[in-house]
Amino acid sequence: AVNEKGYVESVWELLKKHDLGCWAISSHLVGQATCDNIDERHQCILPAHVWGDGNPEGVRQRACAEMALTAQAARKFFDAGKAYMADKPKGSGKTVVNGFTGSSIWHSIYAFPPTSQAYWDAGFADFARRFGPILEAFDKSNVNFALEVHPTEIAFDLASAQRAIEAVKGHKRFGFNYDPSHLGYQGVDYVKFIRAF
């Protein structure tokens, strides 16, 4: 979308044809690969240019670069649709990309074999190291990233959501996409989540 001439305009034309609007875009699948422990399962959810040769660290680095480009694509897309969206409900008034982050520590959630606090700290530090530059790219494009709190992500409940915020030092471009179904399935109080965040 960033470099393809006419692409975003064609999407807006399709939306207009069906009298639809758009208030956020999604980058869940590429986002999943930014912090995940990459294995062969990721190949089927990633574009070929992000998967590359499948080397796990290379996949993560390409996913991070693609997420930074996503901010530019979102800016271009929503700027192209301003006139059309003028008569639609306003929503938040912000440009938002919803998505996933993956997690280098999710697989250890059950804590057996025993998981030390240092292990958890390293996982949140990995998230901050990888996602910090992505959030800076989002800031440069005046776009917000909304993590869908979900199993397999760095934030999957109230405590991990708070730690994710702390890991990125409360970055103004980082927030949450609220989907109570995933919280409910885990027995997390989804009303408390809204009040907390």
Model-assigned labels for residue ranges:
Residues 1, 23-27, 97-100:
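Non-cysteine beta-strand/loop elements that form the S-adenosyl-L-methionine
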Residues 1-16, 101, 106:
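Glycine-rich, proline-tolerant flexible connector loops at the mouths of alpha/beta enzymes
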Residues 7, 157-160, 189-190:
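Residues at alpha-helix caps and immediate loop-helix transition turns in enzyme cores, especially N-
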Residues 8-37:
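Short hydrophobic interaction/assembly module
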Residues 17, 33-178, 185:
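Active-site acidic/histidine proton-transfer and metal-coordination neighborhood
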Residues 186-197:
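A short alpha/beta connector and helix-capping loop motif
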